Amino acid sequence: MTISAVTGGTVITPGGPARADLLIDGGTIAAIGDEGGTIAANEDHGGPGGQRLDASGCYVLPGGVDPHCHLMPGVHPATAAAARGGTTTVLSFTGPAAGESDLDALLRNRGELERGGAVTDIGLHAAIYDPERIGYDELATVKRAGAAAIKIFLAYPELGIMCSTRRLYELMRAARGLGLLVQVHCENAPLIEALVEEGLHAETRPASAGGGADRELFHPGARIFADTRPPEVEEEAVARTLAAASLAGADCYLVHLSSAGSVEQVRLARRRGQRGVFAEVCTHHLLLDNTRYAGADAERYLVCPPLRDRSDVEALWEGLADGTIDTVGSDHCQVKSATTGPLAEAGHCYTYGLAGAGPRLPLLLSAAAARGLPIERVARVAAENPARAFGHYPAKGALAPGSDADIVIFDPDGEAVLPGDGFGDGTGDSVYAGLATRGRIRAVLLRGQLIVSDGVLTDDRRPGRYLPAAGGAA
């Protein structure tokens, strides 16, 4: 169904909330006018067959932009779930096959996306699993392929993907010259290895690592996992990444920050005048804490970095409120990787995230309202800032003339309970199942097409497109 006008709602524009009507033409926003003015009065809303969508009593938000997903291969289930949850643009990391180079994975994944299959629009980040073998020429091809960013891992030596500090600096220098943003997974792998080898348990854990929860109640495997990836291993790697970026004169994007100390590192860097620092948190670190590791189902919540103490959760929300945190991603992982067996028991985890592409925006809107966080701040961290960081603004992440008509109609007085299947994301399990949310997403538009109505997909054509970042190939 083509929508050519959205009327009667409170529109969250780049300048703030406004009672206004939107005119849509050719999949983009043609005009924003005063509520009840000429847009609402005009019966010819932008073209034949277009219908008016009444948003009375609702907020009209830009479609969500999820900056952090692991979807490849097979994007349909997760993008369908994302759409049902109000996300219209998903940015996914590449997924190399066995023996495939990082560059070949990007080009193959791009080809898959260009053939269609996604419900939302979707862009790519180039994950670098072989940092020693990728050079300037390959990075230039990454840029031309439409990726706005590469991702470096300071962890996972057991998988052979860890990047040294020297190589991180060298890649940052190269990326700077190409206009590529460098994303970094910040954990100090040698420290993790030492803690794993020691078999550190709760009774010997240093107090400085944080211990607000009663760790004696933790499931043994989860306790070992959390104790061998304490906040210090993240915070040290954050400081090291910020130093490397400063010396390289490069922009950096810190993925899934989870601790109070990491948030403070970002504040300190900005106070020193360091520019081009982007800080991300993920839904699970905002909504869940490490008391989940006390349950019989503790393994469901194993994620890197692990869930933290309640004090860390509060610090993340403070960073979200004061602008230290720029973006909120889901870190959606389409396949629950190995979290059992000898390696998991030794403290290793290969789950990059938790299934959450669908619940991300409903959870964030609900929790933010409960904390008194303005809805325009939610729109900024869930849509505008991710679009800006990765070269998709203002086509995405904004409700303004010329922007894509990616729109969410959100009823703040509605209520919903999150489904157990994660909005049908294909994983068959959601750690957010049964959580009640304040507010309800009534409708979702992608480029002016109604794709979700009251939680139900209305368009089975899989209309999503591959989305190259600005400066990449069209």
Locate predicted features.
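Divalent metal-coordination and catalytic microenvironments
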Residues: G9, L22, G27, G57, ...
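C-terminal cap of metal-dependent C-N hydrolases
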Residues: P342-A346, P401-L467
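Short, small/polar residue-rich loop motifs at catalytic or cofactor-binding pockets
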Residues: G16-A18, G47, T437-G439
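His/Asp/Glu-enriched, well-ordered alpha-helical/loop segment
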Residues: R223-G249, R300, A321, D326-V328, ...
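Histidine/acidic residue-rich metal-binding segments in metalloenzymes
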Residues: I134-V328
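Alpha-helical scaffold segments that flank or form the walls of functional sites
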Residues: M72-L124, Y129-A148, T165-G177, E236
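N-terminal metal-binding scaffold of metallo-dependent hydrolase/deaminase domains
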Residues: M1-N42
